[in-house]
């Protein structure tokens, strides 16, 4: 199955559709659980699929450093390596290089840095990022972009987005070269892999539109909005998304990277975004915070020690249909790994079910009403009831 995006319904700017990939169909709007090291923390592929996941995200930077892209390619690619049979998106590694790695040196050709694992010298270029992702065999690969910190001066952001555009063109050329025939040292594991461009431009609306226009001219399979949810006010993020989305082709998917909370997702869907990823469901779960339809629930709270109610009475996930708040609190307090598993399963199921309900509301033309009611209930506190 080749890559294809189809819109099925619209409701205002909100869109519902499907993305066909070599590893199955993704219904949009979609949330992608994050599998940083090739695994979504505390969850198996079977758990993810039973929870409704149709696509997950893998991290190029981490998988390149450990266990290595070549090793994964020799195993037949990331799908075979980690046992995930559905769609897979990989980021380019740029965000991690600019946020995790030590002693970075940036130039026109790429970025040199030292691994956060062992201090070894590494060099990431647009071509390297493409080669790594080709070896991983993701269905959707992201181009390498520069990720300047927030806040940054306008002139620095302008220079950064220009570099990101040049790198995007190099990424595109490299993928075409790999698809034309063998390249020594690179073993692609997914002939149907496509690339998404990444719109940058900081908090400057005109620079965002400039970046979008340059990337649209390169004609990628889809487009992401990067560099948001990095400390800017939510209202600024919503303004940027609302300005950029209409500048991207309606016939191609739009992906808001690293976002986010249920509220952020609803606001972005309302502005025309189709894809999301965030570590929040699993990270919060490991810290004892559960998402529910009546707001957040901190399972650490002592008042749940003898509470026999399910975490979320309206949730049909395995955790909520089999276990009580009292038991989950016990597991968390005891440091039992089963607690992280059950909490993570619930939070991921909550996100995926929220996306299902969003898609349904768009198809019925009731998204505005759904959003209003959902946020009204979500802004309560389940652990205060």
Describe these PLM feature segments.
Residues 1-18, 26-30, 42, 145-151, ...:
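C-terminal extensions of enzymes
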Residues 128, 132, 159-170, 210, ...:
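A non-catalytic, amphipathic alpha-helix used as a structural packing/dimerization or gating element
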Residues 162-165, 174, 178-182, 190-311:
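Glycine-rich phosphate/ribose-binding loops and adjacent secondary-structure elements
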Residues 24, 56, 91, 133, ...:
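Conserved, mostly hydrophobic/aromatic
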Residues 174-186, 252, 358-370:
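Surface-exposed helix-capping loop/turn segments at secondary-structure junctions
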Residues 150-153, 158, 222-228, 337-340:
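Glycine- and acidic
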Residues 54, 139, 221, 274, ...:
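Short acidic/polar active-site loop segments enriched in Thr and Asp
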Residues 1-189, 302-305:
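Non-catalytic, usually N-terminal nucleic-acid engagement modules in DNA/RNA processing proteins
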């Amino acid at each position: 199955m080749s890559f294809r995006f189809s819109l099925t319904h619209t409701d205002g700017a909100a869109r519902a559709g499907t993305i066909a990939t070599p590893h199955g169909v993704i219904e949009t709007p979609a949330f992608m659980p994050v599998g940083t090291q090739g695994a979504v923390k505390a969850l198996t592929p079977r758990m993810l699929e039973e929870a409704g996941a149709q696509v997950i995200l893998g991290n190029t930077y981490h998988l390149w450093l450990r266990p290595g892209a070549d090793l994964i390619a020799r195993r037949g690619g990331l799908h075979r390596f980690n046992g995930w049979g559905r769609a897979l998106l990989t980021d380019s590694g740029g965000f991690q290089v600019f946020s995790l790695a030590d002693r970075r040196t940036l130039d026109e050709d790429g970025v040199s840095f030292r691994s956060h694992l062992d201090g070894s010298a590494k060099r990431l270029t647009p071509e390297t990022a493409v080669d790594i992702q080709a070896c991983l065999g993701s269905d959707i690969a992201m181009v390498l972009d520069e990720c300047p910190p927030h806040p940054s001066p306008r002139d620095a952001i302008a220079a950064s987005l220009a570099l990101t555009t040049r790198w995007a063109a190099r990424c595109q050329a490299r993928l075409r070269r790999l698809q034309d025939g063998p390249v020594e040292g690179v073993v692609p594991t997914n002939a149907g892999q496509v690339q998404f461009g990444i719109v940058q431009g900081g908090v400057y609306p005109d620079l965002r539109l400039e970046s979008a226009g340059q990337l649209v001219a390169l004609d990628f399979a889809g487009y992401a909005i990067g560099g948001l949810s990095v400390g800017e006010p939510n209202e600024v993020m919503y303004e940027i998304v609302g300005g950029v989305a209409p500048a991207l082709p309606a016939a191609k998917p739009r992906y808001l990277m690293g976002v986010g909370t249920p509220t952020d997702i609803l606001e972005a869907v309302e502005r025309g975004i189709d894809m999301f990823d965030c570590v929040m469901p699993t990270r919060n779960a490991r810290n004892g915070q559960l998402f529910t339809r009546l707001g957040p629930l901190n399972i650490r709270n002592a008042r749940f020690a003898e509470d026999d109610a399910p975490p979320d009475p309206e949730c049909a996930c395995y955790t909520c249909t089999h276990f009580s708040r009292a038991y989950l609190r016990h597991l968390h307090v005891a440091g039992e790994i089963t607690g992280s598993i059950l909490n993570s399963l619930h939070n991921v199921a909550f996100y995926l079910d929220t996306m299902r309900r969003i898609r349904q509301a768009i198809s019925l033309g009731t998204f505005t009403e759904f959003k209003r009611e959902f946020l009204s209930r979500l802004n309560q506190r389940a652990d205060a009831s």
